[in-house]
Amino acid sequence: MNDRPAEETTIGEAAPAEIAEARPAHIGEPAPAEIAEARPAQIGEPASAAARPDLLADRLPYRIARPYRVRFEEATANESMRTAIYLAWAADIAWQHSTELGFGREWYAERGLFWLVRAIQLDVLRPIPTYAGMLVSTQVLGYRRVAARRESDVRDPSGELAARLLIDWVMTNERGIPTRVPADFLKFVAADTPAIEMHKVALPAAPRDAFERRFHVRRRDLDPLDHVNNSVYVDFLEEALEGAGQGDLLRATPRRYALDFAASAARGESLTGRAWPQDGGWAYRLSREDGTEVFRARVCRL
């Protein structure tokens, strides 16, 4: 997989019309399927009685919702779900949705196509306790020439919003080169869908007193593509922030994560993570021994 040079485009700013190189990222699962306008997450957003059936039900081909449960090993010592699990749920339901639409793993394998995660914005609005049952939805908000954006909401059984993820995916061929989204996918997109602006986290150089953590990629960090799964980068990020004394930030709600996957880390690689305070929140950069950026992130209270 080829590494992509860093682009200095911040979250919310427009990205280039097309991505020059592959953004090796992480879950090889497909992405697409519904359209809706992107909207900011509201704290504890209640669902009206009339809206609840729609929020919690499928609207094929555009959206599906599925039940998930927080397992014991997915919770932290304070009895709330680990942040990384939001990403795992969102990737899993995206795969389920694509499969229901007829674009399963066999379809992608026959064509040598892959969906790779480029960037994620995650708003955690309230903690989810151990063993809680939740409903996770997925839909496609729009496409660029080689990319798609999905939105996933995490709601309790009453319809109250607990978290929202905006996930930018890039379609690549078997060589890791970005390629056009097949025309077959466009029939799931409304004609008036607004153009999406690809998310990006741009960071300055880390200060000399930044918290630093060096480690190697472990076997348990790898996914079926034999590189670090994108949800694991959130664990790396939070381990660094906790080491820097920011445990309160990781427990705060609401809070926002801006995540930018610059390259993929492989089995046994030596990595260095640096974390430092920035603009009222905390910044994080993960790099290889040669200085190549692998992952960039920001975390802040909302």
Identify what each model region corresponds to:
Residues 241-276:
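Charge-rich, low-complexity terminal tails
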Residues 112-127, 252-264:
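Small beta-barrel nucleic-acid-binding modules, principally OB-folds
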Residues 11-47:
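Long, intrinsically disordered low-complexity tandem-repeat segments
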Residues 2-4, 44-48, 53-55, 60-66, ...:
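HotDog/MaoC-like acyl-thioester-processing domains
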Residues 2-5, 44-117, 164-166, 172-255:
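Hot-dog-fold acyl-thioester-processing enzymes
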